[in-house]
Amino acid sequence: MNEAIVTRALVKRYGRHAALDGFTLAVPRGSITGLVGRNGAGKTTWMMTVAGFVRPNSGDVSILSRGPFDAAVHAGRFSILPQDSELPNEGRVRALLVGYGRLQGLSKKAAAQSADALIAAFNLSDKANSPIRALSHGMRKRVAVAQAFLGEPEVVMLDEPLSGLDPVEADRLRAFILSRRERTTIVVSSHQLDDIERLCTHVAFVADGKVERMETLRALTSDTGRVAYTLKAAPPGVAALEAACPGVRLVQEGDVVYAEFGDDLSVDAVNAALLPRLLEFGVLSVHPGRSLSDAYLGGLSLR
């Protein structure tokens, strides 16, 4: 099979409320799949169900084609960062990670090597022997995320991994996640659509306990009739630019200019006409297609 995780028609009820109401999703192996949805949509419940912390009322789960989570089968191959995960206050960073690695089935030597590599990757070397209680919220979050990658598991699920991180450490974590692309299947739940768009190869829109739409990021955001130009300085207006580019409608939102055009024009042709005129304002990025936010807010999942 080409799927790392498959869930079919999962239902989880709490009294009359269905936290999962037919949640069906196949996560491709080697993908970074993002879950997008409102609070209470079912993202966290689905993750906890896949991880074996929550028992569904009905439906099927299979991880790596080996059925639902079983520690004897999946230890060392599957891991999770739960939302708002707590770490023992008196545990020391390196010792804690080594211990978690041992629980994943690693030898003492392998657990120590993996812990040391992750401590360095997450910029925690100067805190390796510090107790958790002495760490800031952001540092605790980095330790919690690091434990999910101990021993190079095949599947990692991350629930809000970037929340609570400062911009520098958030960027470091994004780079780390991207470095695992293809060799590790990663599922990320986040309310920050920019993060999902920067990280993910696939995206699932979740609402009312089910998946409304699952596509590649490219399929969700591709649109040959639109290009977004992010500029260092906002132009005083777009009328002159528009006059110089027949067939192109320009919309300005602060320092971003959107070009909208028909099928008779290509992205390359529009770039050739506009970019020379935008250079004086400093072009920071050129993004063909619509944003993930546009795709999500314009879809059924806004219900």
What are the residue ranges of the model-derived segments?
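C-terminal coupling/interaction segments
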Residues: D264-R303
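Helix-to-loop junction immediately C-terminal to a conserved catalytic motif
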Residues: A51
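Catalytic Walker B motif of ABC-type/P-loop ATPase nucleotide-binding domains
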Residues: V156-E160
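Conserved ABC ATPase "signature" region
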Residues: V98, R102, A110-K127
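Conserved ABC transporter NBD signature motif
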Residues: G59-H74
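ABC transporter nucleotide-binding domain
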Residues: R172-G262
